[in-house]
Regions:
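N-terminal secretory targeting signals
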Residues: 1-35, 39-47, 269-309
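Context-gated lysine
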Residues: 3, 7, 32, 50, ...
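Domain-terminus/edge residues, biased toward the C-terminal soluble/receptor-binding domains
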Residues: 148-151, 159-309
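Active-site-adjacent loops and short helices of periplasmic peptidoglycan-processing enzymes
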Residues: 25-168, 172-181
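Intrinsically disordered, low-complexity regions
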Residues: 19, 89, 100, 130, ...
Length: 309
């Protein structure tokens, strides 16, 4: 059963007074990200949520859905030719040039490790013929997954009117992504080196810095724009299973990493039956957002900046 917590000073005082067992829950409810969800990767069960259905900008976590749709339509060994539109995508990018020959696998590495926007556009054109048609496929995939509060307008996450996601939906997309061995490998890669096919070698570092500091965090995807702030979806292997953490709208990158690790720890406690699952709502956010509530009670379900990281 879920506890639903609405933030208020009186309620917080009562919670602190009621039970020592609630200390961790109160701590987690004070996270600074605007929305967060912790999910059991095996079942889809939500272990903790703050504003899970609040629609926010996804930034480059969008590229997780891009990867899912591409893998449904293309073989990773397929070669595509980079278009002028893809090569002209704004930063962050790897510097693709019009006419470059490049494999789908290389583009996936660039989009997910470096968070390259040019690679994301090239992937969309390779998979659907045009960026616009690919976006339609992304939204159809979201509907098929039951993601009621997600809508994409591009494959890279750059800001635009009508593009949004929720922490719950982002966690579910991450859960789907790690079912692909190739995506698990890419999202857990610290450093990658690849060629564009014209003799140009590119070395990229993963934007997910937890890969260097948390041995149990096996993969993840960052996101940042000025509008979206700092975002992240990641998966961590714990003794009790794999835990998904999704955060949107964190004030800073260091805080994003700290809250990811804190929520991983909380999720582990819930899986170990040391805490109850909690849905935590910040009233001011819900008063100003139109959301479709998700029924959480029924849901089971290698390590080697304007920017969209």
């Amino acid at each position: 059963m879920f506890k639903v917590v609405h933030k208020s000073p009186i309620l917080l005082l009562l919670m602190v007074a009621c039970s020592l067992a609630l200390v961790n829950i109160v701590s987690a409810s004070e996270i600074k990200a605007r929305a967060a969800v912790v999910m059991d990767a095996a079942t889809g069960r939500v272990l903790f949520a703050k504003n899970p259905d609040l629609r926010l900008m996804p930034a480059s976590t969008t590229k997780l859905m891009t990867a899912l749709v591409v893998l449904e339509r293309k073989n990773v060994s397929d070669v595509t030719i980079v278009s002028k539109k893809a090569s002209s995508a704004p930063a962050t990018k790897i510097g693709l040039k019009k006419g470059d020959y490049i494999t789908i696998e290389t583009l996936l590495n660039a989009a997910l490790i470096k968070s390259a926007n040019d690679a994301a556009v090239a992937l969309s054109e390779a998979a659907a013929g045009s960026e616009e048609e690919f976006v339609s496929l992304m939204n159809a995939k979201a509907i098929a997954l039951g993601l009621n509060n997600t809508r994409f307008i591009n494959p890279n996450g750059l800001p635009g009117t009508g593009q949004y996601i929720t922490a719950h939906d982002l966690a579910e997309i991450m859960r789907q992504a790690i079912r692909y061995p190739l995506l698990k490998e890419i999202l857990g890669t610290r450093v990658a080196e690849f060629s564009t096919g014209k003799g140009k070698t590119i070395l990229v570092n993963n934007t997910n810095k937890l890969l260097w500091s948390d041995a149990e965090l096996i993969e993840g995807k960052t996101g940042y724009t000025l509008e979206a702030r700092h975002c992240f979806a990641g998966a961590g292997e714990r003794e009790t299973g794999t835990i998904i953490v999704a955060l949107l709208g964190a004030p800073s990158r260091p805080l994003l990493w700290k809250e990811t690790e804190d929520l991983m720890a909380l999720g582990t406690r819930v899986l170990n039956n040391l805490e109850e699952p909690v849905v935590y709502l910040t009233k001011v956010d819900y008063d100003t957002a139109k959301v479709k509530k998700t029924s959480y009670r029924k849901r089971s379900g290698k390590k080697r900046k304007r920017l969209a990281l």
